[in-house]
Each structure stands twice: as C-alpha cells, then as structure tokens.
From Swiss-Prot:
Residues 95-304 form the ABC transmembrane type-1 domain. It is found in: Cell inner membrane. GO terms for molecular function: dipeptide transmembrane transporter activity. It is a multi-pass membrane protein. Belongs to the binding-protein-dependent transport system permease family. Gene3D superfamilies: MetI-like (1.10.3720.10). InterPro entries: BPD_transp_1_N, MetI-like, MetI-like_sf. Coiled coil: none annotated. The keyword Glycoprotein does not apply. This is Putative peptide transport system permease protein BRA1092/BS1330_II1084. GO terms for cellular component: plasma membrane. The complex is composed of two ATP-binding proteins (BRA1094), two transmembrane proteins (BRA1092 and BRA1093) and a solute-binding protein (BRA1090).
Length: 314
C-alpha cells in the first residue's frame, strides 16, 4: 500500500507542474496591464513603466514563467495588487468558507443521492424511478445561478427562512453557521444528487442482475439482506469513485454559489480578482484549486484500491 501511495503521488507531480504552467500561460491571455491597474488611470507612462519593472513584467514570458515556478517551489504565490497581502494569506482566510460549503453540500448529496438511487433500482420503472431520472436531467439542464436566484427570492426574501447573503463562522455561532450555509449548500447539492442517484441506480441494477443475487433470493435470503449486504456492498465501490468526483464538482460549483450568496470564499475571491485584473490572486487561486482537484483524485484512487484490492493501477 505504501508503494501504491508513493506511486500515485509521483504520478501527480508532473500533472501539478502542467497545471502550474497552464495557469501562468492562461493569465497571460487576459486583457489589461496590471501595472496600469496599480498605478491608476491618471498615472504617467514613467510611473507605469517603473511598476512594470518592479513586478518583473518587462521580462520575457519565459523568464517570468521561470520566476513564477521558482517562487512556487518556495511556496510563494506572490502578493495581491489590490488586497496588499500575500496571496497565500488571502487564500487561507477564505478557504474555510469554501470547504465548509462543499462539505455541507457533500453531506447532503451522499446520503440522499445513494438512498434515492437504491430505492429507484429496487422500484425499477416506477413513478419514483422516473422521478429520480427527471431530477438527474434537471441537474444537467438547469443553470445553478438561475435556481440559486429563485431560492433566494422564495426562501430568503419572500418567506424569510434563511439569510440571503453573508457568512457566520462556525466558532462564532454553530447555528448561525448552519443557517448561513444550508440554503446555498442545498442548491449546490441538488445538481449532484440527481447525478449520484442515477449512478447508484445504474450500478445497483447491474449488480442485481448477477447470478449470485438470484442465488441468494432462491435460498430465501430476505430482500433487505439482498439489497444491503450483497447488492449495495458490491455497487459501493463504483459509487466511491463517483463521490470523489462529486466533491471536486462541489468545490468548482461554489464559485457561482458564493457570488450569488455573497459568501467570502475562494470562488468569490476568484471572481473579484478576475474583474479587477489582480493576476497574482487569480493565478494563486486557480493553481490552488487545481492542486486540490489533483489531490482529491489521488486520494480517491487510493481509497478505490483499498475498497477493492482487485484493482491495480499501471
């Protein structure tokens, strides 16, 4: 197992390097000059040029990329143009909000999605089964921002059940933390519940058609034991892999949700940095999210192998 972990980590290193290089090059394609942004609209050309020299923007792209990778190797993501603080500090301050939102949405998605998928498989071709498939289609076709706006209008503005914006830290008030996140987390989870339910249903149907399931039923094993002990346990391996992918999607989907609900997380930080052309923050945030996705995939691969020792990665 140790060899597997070391192998997966070693395979992830070049992927992370590619993510870092692509992040830097994509930022070069953004319009606007950071030096002009820092200097202000009324700054003289001499002032703008001086700032460009100080930031190293006058250097060739290859030199800037080398400096960026060197700083990254020393865990230096640079300094924000507008926040006047290190990018790593800005990310660290907002990371708990994004992780809290994603974890709460994940805690909603996994049990609800799995239960719906299992029941839909058991009640194949029933109204409940068709409802689950409709929910999965809804998650693919309906934009998250549109549903989030409707939820704010209904549950916050009209009914007043939940706050429409803002975030309460967990240590300040656990109940306030839950009230500030339950609505955005539910909207974020809704789009993944249908996907997980459909995947669970598909895996359950495939397992339930196997010979050993029919053998268990012929021996008089209760239907509950057939579903929970035999069918679900074997279908769980594939569901585990999808769960890691879903958590990555929840973190990525938080960008839109945080913006609508004014949550001070990484997604909102990224959007504000893009609008303000704060390139160090954009680079650092995108790079951190990319590394986080890679780390999640590595962890899922390891858990997948633990859950099913028959699986081997070349």
């Amino acid at each position: 197992m140790t060899a597997l972990i070391l192998k997966r980590v070693a395979q992830a290193i070049p992927v992370m390097l590619i993510v870092a290089i692509l992040t830097f090059l994509l930022m070069k394609l953004l319009p606007g000059d950071p030096a002009i942004l820092i200097a202000g609209d009324g700054a003289s050309p001499e002032t703008v040029e001086r700032i460009r020299v100080e930031l190293g923007l006058d250097q060739p792209t290859v030199v800037q990329l080398g400096q960026w990778l060197w700083n990254l190797f020393h865990f230096d993501l640079g300094r924000s143009f507008l926040l006047s603080q290190p990018v790593s500090q800005a990310i660290a301050e907002r990371l708990p909000v994004t992780i809290s939102l994603a974890l709460l949405a994940f805690a909603i998605t996994i049990p609800v999605g799995i239960i719906m998928g299992v029941v839909a498989a058991y009640l194949r071709d029933s109204w409940f089964d068709m409802g689950v498939m409709s929910l999965a289609l809804l998650g693919v076709s309906v934009p998250s921002f549109w549903l989030a706006i409707l939820a704010v209008i209904l549950f916050s503005v009209t009914l007043g059940w939940f706050p429409s914006a803002g975030y309460v830290p967990f240590l300040d008030s656990p109940l306030g933390w839950l009230r500030s996140l339950i609505l955005p987390a539910s909207i974020l989870a809704l789009f993944q519940i249908g996907y997980l339910a459909r995947m669970t249903r598909s895996e359950m149907l495939e397992v339930m058609d196997q010979d050993y399931i029919r053998t268990a039923r012929s021996k008089g094993v209760s239907e509950y034991s057939v579903l929970s002990t035999h069918a679900f346990r074997n279908a769980l391996v594939s569901v585990l892999t999808v769960s890691g992918y879903i958590f990555s999607l929840l973190i990525g989907g938080s960008v839109v949700i945080e913006q609508i609900f004014a949550l001070p997380g990484l997604g909102r930080l990224l959007v504000q940095a893009i609008l303000a052309r704060d390139l160090p923050v954009v680079q650092g945030t995108m790079l951190f999210l990319g590394f986080l996705f890679v780390a999640i995939n590595v962890l899922v691969d390891i858990l997948y192998t633990i859950a099913d020792p028959r699986v081997h990665y070349d």
